[in-house]
């Protein structure tokens, strides 16, 4: 299944706020109307929708998300918590959380077009897994800095998660540590996502 490129508002109306996909929010009461319209949801549908929230927020294909679930399942600790850490530490998501891009698709475009450096080297792989002490900067070119400045000027200036530091005048972000689960940028029940995949195998 390919990455979603359809109408974004249609997705948030059904699944709720997806800040990584779009800065728009569903209208008040739309979740309740959806529930009334669809009647009682089955447990399968509840797990499916939670999985879809995760997939659309982080902009992943079905195959990519399944790969992350399998990696998380082999790691020590809670599979759900490890899964969220893996997704949150992706380079495209780190740029989004720093405010250097307004959405994760926008961050992915910056990376693909080679505007971003990690530790002084160009990285053009959005899924690059950031590590503590990584330094994320833009290229010195005027176009690269203008793009980032535009995003920084229009960002909502929300409190940064504790694992990140932004030096906006230097167009630089620092990864201080692996993210703590309470700073994940999406309201999600990750256990339902893990359950969804465990029942598919």
Swiss-Prot record:
Its main location: plastid. InterPro entries: Ribosomal_uS4, Ribosomal_uS4_bac-type, Ribosomal_uS4_CS, Ribosomal_uS4_N, S4_RNA-bd, S4_RNA-bd_sf. CDD domains: S4. GO terms for biological process: ribosomal small subunit biogenesis; translation. It holds the Pfam family S4. Keywords: Chloroplast, Plastid, Ribonucleoprotein, Ribosomal protein, RNA-binding, rRNA-binding. Residues 89-149 form the S4 RNA-binding domain. GO terms for molecular function: rRNA binding; structural constituent of ribosome. It is found in: Plastid, Chloroplast. GO terms for cellular component: chloroplast; small ribosomal subunit. Residues 19-38 are annotated as: Disordered. HAMAP family: Ribosomal_uS4_B. One of the primary rRNA binding proteins, it binds directly to 16S rRNA where it nucleates assembly of the body of the 30S subunit. Belongs to the universal ribosomal protein uS4 family. Part of the 30S ribosomal subunit. Contacts protein S5. The interaction surface between S4 and S5 is involved in control of translational fidelity. This is Small ribosomal subunit protein uS4c. It comes from Platanus occidentalis (Sycamore).
């Amino acid at each position: 299944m390919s990455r979603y490129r359809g109408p974004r508002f249609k997705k948030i109306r059904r699944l709720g706020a997806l800040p990584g996909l779009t800065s728009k929010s569903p209208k008040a009461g739309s979740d309740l109307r959806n529930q009334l319209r669809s009647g009682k949801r089955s447990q399968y549908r509840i797990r499916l929708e939670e999985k879809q929230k995760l997939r659309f927020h982080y902009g992943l294909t079905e195959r990519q998300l399944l790969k992350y679930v399998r990696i998380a399942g082999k790691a020590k600790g809670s599979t759900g918590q490890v899964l969220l850490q893996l997704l949150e530490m992706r380079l495209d998501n780190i740029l989004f959380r720093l405010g250097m891009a307004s959405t994760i698709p926008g961050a992915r475009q910056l990376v693909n077009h080679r505007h971003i450096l990690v530790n002084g080297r160009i990285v053009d792989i959005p899924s690059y897994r950031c590590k503590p002490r990584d330094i994320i900067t833009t290229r010195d070119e005027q176009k690269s800095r203008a793009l980032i400045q535009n995003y920084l000027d229009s960002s909502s200036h929300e409190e940064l998660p504790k694992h990140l530091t932004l030096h906006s005048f230097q167009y630089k972000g620092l990864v201080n540590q692996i993210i703590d689960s309470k700073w994940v940028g999406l309201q999600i029940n990750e256990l339902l996502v893990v359950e969804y995949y465990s029942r598919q195998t």
